[in-house]
């Protein structure tokens, strides 16, 4: 039999093992895995390379439409492809208007036309003002609903995102449970974090350490505990976003052991940066929840290796450089990171700490695809879409600003020596990024709708 593409001699990350084996692709899907697979129109030799499922990044902010000067589909998805991401799940905030009903999600789809280098799924927003319109987003095909119990949104902009109070969260989660949807939550205690932050600013405490102290671990843990209880009472699946503390992970683990349907994610920056480095890097490393100390980081690595964290995500949330000006308490909180999720975590988790390749594949791709119902994504297996990434191990480079594809070429990882490289990214059988040739085909990404897979 003749195939469209055969990838030969790579160490392939399968679900429960990794071994040198060939992959045949036909019609954009994986047709066979094995040896001596036959002929193909195109053959790629992956000798010495790791062949991973393309990353499913379940937490990105592209900011288009309305804030394309922050980021945009063209720049953001090129950066994603260069970083080994083949599917992103887009958040309903940072763009204007926020994605909270049928009209606003259609604006997202229109804005993305012809610009997606990778595939994308979309989350709807659960906000204080759209409880009676959640069904519109479900009908369109979002794969989940995001909300904040921490303060968010610009109160001076009518159509910006808004946090929810406990009543709004409970009522919204009830409705989402009836739709068989998942609610995703940014978990920090709004009032305590806000007051601690204002107190620090009044007293002139504006360093990175002061910012971290204004959003202590207990504010994350309390919020996780609260939304776990409310989501359970409402009968809704829960996904806890960007957990930053081992104590927070423990709350999820305890609930899971008691039978609750709950998952959680974390981000590379909580594993590879600490508060001292945050102080050194400055506002480019500001995010919330904040980057914590080395002891906290050690605990996070233990939770990751124990299997208590389901997936790793970028929480890519860039902004114009002027919004990062001033002191740390004043600056916008958000990290530009999606281009360096895979290479940084392959280096830090696999090469430096001995994580198995199958576990790496689950954390970067498989589990997120399963959590959000992306049926054709996240695995190297017959019948799945041929979304693949070639990783060159033990190949160090220093990240430079000009390497970045973002609208604004800044990142807290600039200057970092990264010990692995993404050399090729394949989306549905086509090479969309190559380290030597850049982006060889026009954008071919498409939106994935929950009900139309």
From Swiss-Prot:
UniProt keyword list: Hydrolase, Metal-binding, Purine metabolism, Zinc
Q: Where does Zn(2+) 2 bind?
A: 146, 186, 242
Q: Where does Zn(2+) 1 bind?
A: 59, 61, 146, 315
Query: What post-translational modification does the entry describe?
Result: Carboxylation allows a single lysine to coordinate two zinc ions.
- Any one GO biological process: purine nucleobase catabolic process
The prosthetic group or cofactor this protein requires is: Zn(2+)
Q: Which reaction does this enzyme catalyse, per its entry?
A: (S)-allantoin + H2O = allantoate + H(+)
Report the SUPFAM superfamilies cross-referenced here: Composite domain of metallo-dependent hydrolases, Metallo-dependent hydrolases
Q: Name one GO molecular function term.
A: allantoinase activity
- Which positions carry N6-carboxylysine? 146
**Tagged with keyword Hydrolase:** yes
Pathway stated in the Swiss-Prot or TrEMBL entry: Nitrogen metabolism; (S)-allantoin degradation; allantoate from (S)-allantoin: step 1/1
Q: Where is it found, in Gene Ontology cellular component terms?
A: cytoplasm
EC nos: 3.5.2.5
Q: Which family does it belong to?
A: Belongs to the metallo-dependent hydrolases superfamily. Allantoinase family.
Q: How does it assemble?
A: Homotetramer.
In terms of HAMAP family, this protein maps to:
Hydantoinase (MF_01645)
Q: What does this protein do?
A: Catalyzes the conversion of allantoin (5-ureidohydantoin) to allantoic acid by hydrolytic cleavage of the five-member hydantoin ring.
Q: What is this protein called?
A: Allantoinase
Annotated source species: Salmonella paratyphi B (strain ATCC BAA-1250 / SPB7)
State the gene name recorded for this protein.
Answer: allB
């Amino acid at each position: 039999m003749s195939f469209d593409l055969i990838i030969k001699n790579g160490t392939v990350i399968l679900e429960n093992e990794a071994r040198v084996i060939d992959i045949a692709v036909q019609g954009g899907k994986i047709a066979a895995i094995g040896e001596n697979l036959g002929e193909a129109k195109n053959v790629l030799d992956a000798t010495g390379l790791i062949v991973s499922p393309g990353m499913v990044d379940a937490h990105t902010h592209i900011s288009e439409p309305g804030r394309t000067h922050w980021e945009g589909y063209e720049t953001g998805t090129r950066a994603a492809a260069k970083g080994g991401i083949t599917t992103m799940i887009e958040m309903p905030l940072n763009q204007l208007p926020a994605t909270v009903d049928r009209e606003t999600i259609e604006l997202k789809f229109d804005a993305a036309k012809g610009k997606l280098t990778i595939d994308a799924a979309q989350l709807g927003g659960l906000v204080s003002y759209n409880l009676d319109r959640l069904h519109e987003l479900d009908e369109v095909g979002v794969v989940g609903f995001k909300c904040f119990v921490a303060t968010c949104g610009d109160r001076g902009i009518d159509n910006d995102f808004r946090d929810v109070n406990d009543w709004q969260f409970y009522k919204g989660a009830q409705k989402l449970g009836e739709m068989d949807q998942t609610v995703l939550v940014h978990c920090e205690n709004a009032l305590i974090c806000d007051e601690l932050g204002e107190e620090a600013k009044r007293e002139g405490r504006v360093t990175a350490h002061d910012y971290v102290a204004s959003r202590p671990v207990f504010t994350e843990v309390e919020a996780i505990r609260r939304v776990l209880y409310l989501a359970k009472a409402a009968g809704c699946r829960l996904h806890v976003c960007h957990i930053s503390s081992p104590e927070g992970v423990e709350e999820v683990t305890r609930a899971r052991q008691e039978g609750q349907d709950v998952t959680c994610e974390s981000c590379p920056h909580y594993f590879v940066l600490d508060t001292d480095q945050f102080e050194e890097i400055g506002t480019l490393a500001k995010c919330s929840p904040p980057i914590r100390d080395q002891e906290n980081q050690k605990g996070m690595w233990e939770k990751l290796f124990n299997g208590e964290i389901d997936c790793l995500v970028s929480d890519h949330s860039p902004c114009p450089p002027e919004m990062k000006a001033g002191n740390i308490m004043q600056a916008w909180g958000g990290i530009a990171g999606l281009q360096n999720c895979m290479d940084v975590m392959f280096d830090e988790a696999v090469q430096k700490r001995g994580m198995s390749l199958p576990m790496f594949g689950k954390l970067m791709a498989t589990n997120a695809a399963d959590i959000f119902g992306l049926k054709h994504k996240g695995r190297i297996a017959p019948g799945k879409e041929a979304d693949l990434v070639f990783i060159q191990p033990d190949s160090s480079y220093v990240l430079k600003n000009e390497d970045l594809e973002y609208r604004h070429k800044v990142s807290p990882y600039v200057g970092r020596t990264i010990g692995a490289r993404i050399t090729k990214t394949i989306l549905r059988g086509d090479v969309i990024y190559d380290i030597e040739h850049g982006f060889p085909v026009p954008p071919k990404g498409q939106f994935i709708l929950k009900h139309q897979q």
